[in-house]
C-alpha cells in the first residue's frame, strides 16, 4: 500500500511536470500557514512550526520541499478533474433521477437535483483520474529495487 502511494505520487509529479505546473513561494507559504498543527489561537505560530518539525526530525527546507510536492500533485489532479464535465445525455440521466425522487417541495427538489448532479460529476471525475493514472503507468518509468526494501 505504501509502495503504491509512492509510485502514484511519483507519477502525478511527472504529470504535473508535463503539464507545466509549478508551486509559487506564496502558494507554499499559504498552505503551510493554514495547517492547524502550526497554529496557536487560530494564527500561524513560527515557534510551533519549528518545534513540530524538529520533533519529527525535519528541517524547514525538507518539509517545505515535501509540502511543495504534495501541492503539485494536487494541482495535477485538479487539472484533470476540472477538465471533466457532464455531457447532455448525462444531464438527461440526472434529470430522470431527479424526477424519480418525486419531491414536491421546490427547495428540497432543488437540493436533491444539485446533489444528484454533483454526485454524477464526482463519479465521472474519479473515473477520469483513474484512467489518467492508468495511462501514466505506461509512460512513467518506475524502477523498484526490491533489495532495498
Where are these regions (language model features)?
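Peptidyl-prolyl cis-trans isomerase
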Residues: 1-149
